[in-house]
Amino acid sequence: MNYKLFSPYTIKDVTLKNRIVMSPMCMYSSKNEDGQITNFHLIHYGTRAAGQVGLVMIEATAVLPEGRISNKDLGIWDDSLIEGLHKATTFIHDNGAKAAIQLAHAGRKAELETDALAPSAIPFNETMKMPIEMSKHQIKDTVLAFQQAAVRSKQAGFDVIEIHGAHGYLINEFLSPLTNKRTDEYGGSPENRYRFLREIIESINEVWNGPLFVRISANDYHPDGLTVQDYVQYTKWMKEQGVDLIDCSSGAVVPARIDVYPGYQVQYAKHIKEHANIATGAVGLITTGAQAEQILNNNEADLIFIGRELLRNPYFSRIAANELGFELEEPYQYERAPGKISTNK
């Protein structure tokens, strides 16, 4: 029997062998605080590739040193960082998966000794520092940094780029009226609040012709914040600009209580897919093969982003295949261990 979860998926000229994506998750493991890939990262990402994930996405990687969430984040702000990232893509490719990178700037959530930057001088909460409102010059420099990061991503051998526009980081801060109180062309109307992301996408398109994803927070979980319907318009603009897929997460732009349950964010992937007519990725407490297969069969999303479940078990793909009764092609090195495996939950 054929299963959609294990069917190929082609975006532009890149074909994923299945619909399982390793969701980007910060490991805070650049131990020398220089943004460099370490041996841990090679093992971490390579193991998930060997575990038969279709697309392995490297964690949020800062386009500027001051754009890191922490000083142990990965970086792509300098050519000296390309070599390490190329080792990672080679490791991933050699183990049978495609490689993606998430380009990011933490904005007001940067927990560094340097000043935090944001569209407006509003802290995330009472314990975090007051950010500095970005000047237009700083905005232009950041747009350029995303473009230069895309060039380095290409040189490092990545197949897919994802722009991190979610979770209350810099791009999300520009999009949301809760965090963007500017009165210039970068604030006010939805068109103006989208301008920063528009310029980033335009700049990346000048140097990158591969698949381009954007991760969004499709709900601010605040009465005065953005809802998934607001993001329908944003994603229509993204599609017009050539974005290929929307990775649908939610929350974290402001402190909020969120009702979390299995597949709680799938509704956003479905809504965006249906109303913006664009491919989507579903993420959030997707933990079994049956659950993932149902999402795809219901046409609620095109790709399944797996996060914590892949931290618990890097061989999630094999377990999902066994659960569904699908014969997954194994690395030849593992052929001596046939039969079912389980997580023993």
Swiss-Prot record:
Its EC number is 1.6.99.1. Substrate binds at residues 28, 164-167. Pfam families: Oxidored_FMN. CDD domains: OYE_YqiM_FMN (cd02932). SUPFAM superfamilies: FMN-linked oxidoreductases. GO terms for biological process: response to toxic substance. Catalyzes the reduction of the double bond of an array of alpha,beta-unsaturated aldehydes and ketones. It also reduces the nitro group of nitroester and nitroaromatic compounds. It could have a role in detoxification processes. This is NADPH dehydrogenase. It comes from Bacillus cereus (strain AH187). The gene is namA.
